[in-house]
UniProtKB/Swiss-Prot annotation:
Residues 1-39 are annotated as: Disordered. This is Fuctinin-3. Keywords: Cytoplasm. The lineage of its organism: Eukaryota, Metazoa, Chordata, Craniata, Vertebrata. Gene3D superfamilies: 1.20.5.1500. The keyword Cytoplasm applies. It comes from the Eukaryota.
């Protein structure tokens, strides 16, 4: 219900947030790969 009340600018923010999340996931995956190499 809270998401629907914010639906006016949802498209604009969701796209930016999605890209930021993808970039963050890439960083985390890179860190995991590094940890796996040292393990």
């Amino acid at each position: 219900k809270e998401l629907n009340s914010n639906h006016d600018g949802a498209d604009e923010t969701s796209e930016k947030e999605q890209q930021e999340a993808i970039e963050h996931i890439d960083e985390v995956q890179n860190e995991i790969d590094r940890l796996n190499e040292t393990a």
